[in-house]
A protein has these predicted regions:
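Well-ordered beta-sheet/strand-loop patches within structured domains
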Residues: 8, 12-16, 20, 28-35, ...
Length: 329
């Protein structure tokens, strides 16, 4: 019985260690409210593989994460733990980042774009080299006490009780298209929390901001005449679209990728925001500092890039196309 218990405990410990090192100790979907990246977790096949191993040392070596970043963190962790004067928060920070690197995320391939939300930065990698890098603005942090406040809102249904949560979700997708001079379909949440009040305070706000108002799919000819006091924010029957142009909140470029959160990368008409240290200020989408440079990297074709430039009233790089540009202007 003692030997049997020892065998069971050893097997259980080996399985737990394998899962911890190979998959991570935490399921990120349980940690983050807006985590939409597919993550591989332990299953019966992984357990069977551990139990059937004939070389434990080989197994322990094979499950160690091999990424250069992980190995750097391993070295740093050993160094800080050996130094009695090291600050505990540094050890904790390293351990948290090692845990993130254990999560089995989808293969990114040789070329990919990474938006680092805490760092407010975007980097385009190719074969581990950096093609381009720029600042970004991301979604604002959720309101303090959000969990309790959202419960209150769900009970009351009163928008005044609704707490703010504009955090940019964590997701994985593929960039598939560029929209030039985009129209902004204003989300219901922004219409209720911002557009409604702006229109109440200033009857000409909508027309001055190039915002069109629609009712049951039809555009209202004179939105300045709408009597907003007749409508509640909770049951606002209108849809709002901001036309393309200099004042458009999306700027001149919108970069689209599939996701269930209506998130995209885009230009902005508020360039001063990139001078701020804390750039968690958007409603969730990601504003990019250098949209033209990002577009050039994305299309990878000089002719297409010149087409994009001319669509936003910029001269083409190819001087042979200047006649086309002047005619367009």
């Amino acid at each position: 019985p003692v030997i049997a218990d020892l065998g069971l405990n050893t097997a259980e410990g080996l399985i737990k260690y394998n899962n911890f090192v190979y998959y991570g100790s935490i399921n990120p979907r349980k940690l983050f409210s807006r985590y939409y990246v597919p993550v591989k977790r332990p299953d019966s096949l992984s357990v069977t593989a551990v139990l059937q191993t004939k070389d434990i040392q080989k197994l322990l070596t094979s499950i160690q994460p091999s990424s250069p970043d992980y190995q750097i963190f391993q070295h740093k962790l050993s160094k800080y733990k050996a130094d009695s004067g090291s600050k505990s928060y540094m050890v904790k920070t390293i351990m948290v980042n090692m845990e993130r690197l254990r999560w089995k995320l989808p293969e990114l391939g040789d070329e990919y774009v990474q938006v680092n939300i805490p760092d407010f930065s975007l980097t385009w990698f190719k074969n581990q080299d950096t093609l381009t890098q720029m600042k970004v603005c991301v979604g604002g942090k959720r309101e303090e006490g959000y969990a309790d406040k959202i419960k209150q809102y769900l009970k009351s249904g009163n928008l005044d009780d609704k707490p703010k949560n504009h955090e940019t979700p964590l997701l994985y997708s593929k960039l598939n298209s560029i929209q030039v001079n985009p129209i902004w379909n204003i989300p219901v949440s922004i219409a209720q929390s911002e557009i409604y009040w702006q229109a109440v305070r200033d009857p000409y706000y909508l027309s001055n901001s190039n915002i069109k108002v629609y009712y049951k799919g039809k555009q209202i000819g004179e939105p300045d005449t709408i009597q907003w006091s007749k409508y509640s924010r909770e049951n606002l029957p209108f849809q709002f679209k901001q036309g393309s142009g200099e004042g458009n909140a999306l700027g001149k470029f919108k970069f689209i990728f599939d996701n269930g959160s209506s998130i995209y990368l885009h230009d902005t008409n508020n360039k001063s925001a990139f001078t701020r240290a804390n750039r968690a200020i958007s409603h969730g989408c990601v504003r990019v500092e250098k949209p033209l440079q990002f577009a050039e990297t994305l299309v990878k074709d000089k002719y297409e890039y010149d087409q994009l430039r001319m669509e936003v009233n910029l001269p083409p790089i190819d001087t042979n196309r200047m006649a086309v540009y002047r005619k367009k202007m």
